[in-house]
Curated annotation (Swiss-Prot):
Tissue expression pattern: Ubiquitous.
Keyword Repeat appears in the UniProt entry: yes
Record protein name field: Probable E3 ubiquitin-protein ligase ARI7
Pathway(s) of this molecule: Protein modification; protein ubiquitination
Molecular functions per Gene Ontology: ubiquitin-protein transferase activity; zinc ion binding
Zn-finger segments (IBR-type): 206-268
Record field: compositional bias (Acidic residues): 27-39
Annotated stretches, region: Disordered: 1-39, 524-562
One Pfam family per UniProt: IBR_1
Coiled-coil regions listed in the entry: none
Family, as annotated: Belongs to the RBR family. Ariadne subfamily.
Source lineage: Eukaryota, Viridiplantae, Streptophyta, Embryophyta, Tracheophyta
Cofactor note: Binds 4 Zn(2+) ions per subunit.
Length: 562
């Protein structure tokens, strides 16, 4: 079976030029399975659901628990009807074949006997004796009347007490209970959920049903649970658009490919490296190398933050040495420069003895400063994003109702404020990851770095204008005594800033995902233009009359303006 990455890559190869924010299909009903519509937000859904689905793309659908159960039952009924088997047997088949109805049909009609044997569905059920004679339990070997004995399709008799203990143990052991077989070691007959419903306790039945529900998502390559803590929604993903960012109704956005938080415009490998770098010890070692020196005796790193050059290592070492030359302090004094200088160090430095050490320290310092620059801004945008999410919640819970009363405007006409906050939250996320992008952008590609920093700076400026408008300018209307004649102008301004900022950030994302290809194309055009001009000048020098003049003039094509 192909891996999930292979499936997604295949979709990517088949797709044309990616439209990253338009989604893949017009509706989730366009999927191959032809499953019923389970949309993003119902018409009577509350505002929070509407807000959470604001950026929902058409290449995925959010599934609630009731949606998942409905799909499970639909699949079970389809298999049961087509194969003329019970729903219990159909659920066992689907669970074995990872809830793929098509594969169940293919395997069953190709070799029904083999499938029955593999899955544990017997063609003919063994009927226990109908008389009143007692039966012996195959586990405890006690004799019981027929009403105290239970069995599955194989007919092996076990008392209800042993069955209950067997089922309880397997359920508490984990999801393996979904593949339960007859307790007889030589028998492979499957145990369905009907036996669980009959003999398990209420808590165990609830746990079994939870495993059963989760198996539908976890066994399906195009479905995943939302990774947000405490979220019970699942995502049904349709590959093909090249955009792997999905947004759950809980408001958490994540990457379908790596299940980390949504991270466009950087790819999954860059995110993995960045997260690892943020949590690894490499930057700690860089800091130690840049800001400390090892004790000459015990090699423990020591930081000098103030005072003279006389250093004393911590116990039990207690070695006294010079910070500059690392020599024993007993060899130092007024003749070597006193407490704040070291002649020995200056002489050795001039002779080049510390060149390699200083070079390493300088490299570590530069590396640390560069990382700190990008990390601080990455973290700052994350903090700003969290603050914007809190402000959005406050706008939903308090400000909209208050503003509606003050301005005599229905809340339905104030959604432009929520749209602005949503756009700010999204832009903060994008801006945050541009700093990871910039950190890994090769330093020798100067043109790309300049273009990137320009785009990033413009994005920050535009976002700040939008943020200030919705955060500061709105206050005057919240504290106003009554309707303000300037409110419509504010609405127009905020809606316009939201639209402009959205378009700019979409273009920024596309530019970065394309590797800033515009820089290369502009460089190529400039090179081509320069070459054409040079050729034109040569022709003009050698040629005669208007012909050579036109040759020179024709080299000025529209590319020259790029």
């Amino acid at each position: 079976m192909d891996s999930e990455e292979d499936m997604l890559d295949a979709h990517d190869m088949e797709s044309g030029e990616d439209d990253f924010y338009s989604g893949g299909t017009d509706d989730c009903n366009d999927s191959d399975d032809g499953e019923p519509d389970y949309g993003f937000v119902e018409e009577d859904a509350d505002d929070s659901a509407m807000i959470a689905s604001h950026r929902s793309q058409k290449n995925f659908c959010v599934l609630r628990e009731e949606d998942i159960r409905r799909h499970q039952m639909d699949n079970i009924e389809r298999v049961s009807v087509v194969l003329s088997i019970t729903e219990v047997e159909a659920s066992i088949l689907l669970r074995h074949f990872h809830w793929s109805v098509g594969r169940v049909h293919d395997e069953w009609f190709a070799d029904e006997e083999r499938v029955r044997k593999t899955v544990g569905i017997l063609e003919s059920h063994v009927v226990p004796p109908s008389d009143d004679s007692e039966l012996t339990c195959g586990i405890c070997f006690d004799s019981y009347p027929p009403e105290k004995i239970a069995s599955v399709s194989c007919g092996h008799p076990f008392c209800t007490t042993c069955w209950t203990g067997y089922i309880s143990t397997t359920i508490n052991d984990g999801p393996g209970c979904l593949m339960l077989r007859c307790p007889d070691p030589s028998c492979l007959a499957a145990v369905g959920h009907d036996m669980v419903d009959k003999l398990a306790s209420e808590d165990e039945k609830e746990k079994y049903n939870r495993y059963f529900l989760r198996s539908y998502i976890e066994d399906n390559r195009k479905m995943k649970w939302c990774p947000a803590p405490g979220c019970d929604f699942a995502i049904d993903f349709v590959a093909g658009s090249g955009n792997y960012d999905v947004s759950c109704l809980c408001s958490f956005s994540f990457c379908w490919n790596c299940t980390e938080e949504a991270h466009r415009p950087v790819d999954c490998s860059t995110v993995s490296k960045w997260i690892l770098k943020n949590s690894a010890e490499s930057e700690n070692m860089n800091w130690i190398l840049a800001n400390s020196k090892p004790c000459p005796r015990c090699k423990r790193p020591i930081e000098k933050n103030q005072g003279c050059m006389h250093m004393t290592c911590t116990p039990p070492c207690k070695y006294e040495f010079c910070w500059l030359c690392l020599g024993a302090w007993m060899d130092h004094g007024e003749r070597t420069g006193g407490f704040y200088a070291c002649n020995r160090y200056e002489v050795a430095k001039q002779e080049g003895q510390y060149d390699e050490t200083e070079r390493r320290r300088e490299m570590a310092k530069n590396s640390l400063e560069r990382y700190t620059h990008y990390y601080e801004r990455w973290a700052s945008n994350q903090t700003s994003r969290q603050k914007a999410m809190a402000d959005l919640q406050q706008a939903q819970m308090q400000n909209l109702e208050k503003l509606s009363d003050k301005q005599c405007t229905p809340e339905s006409q104030l959604k432009f404020i929520l749209e602005a906050w949503l756009q700010i939250i999204e832009c903060r996320r994008v801006l945050k990851w541009t700093y990871a992008y910039g950190y890994y952008l090769p330093e020798h590609e100067h043109a790309k770095r300049q273009f990137f920093e320009y785009l990033q700076g413009e994005a920050e400026s535009g976002l700040e204008r939008l943020h200030q408008c919705v955060e500061k300018d709105l206050v005057q209307f919240l504290i106003a005594e009554g309707p303000s004649k300037d409110f419509n102008d504010f609405r127009t301004k905020l809606a316009g800033l939201t639209s402009v900022t959205k378009n700019y950030f979409e273009n920024l994302v596309k530019a970065l995902e394309n590797g800033l290809a515009d820089v290369d194309s502009h460089a190529a055009c400039s090179s081509k233009s320069t070459s054409s001009k040079s050729t034109g000048c040569s022709s003009k020098t050698r040629g005669k009359g208007k012909g050579s003049s036109r040759t020179g003039g024709s080299s000025r094509n529209p590319d020259d303006n790029l």
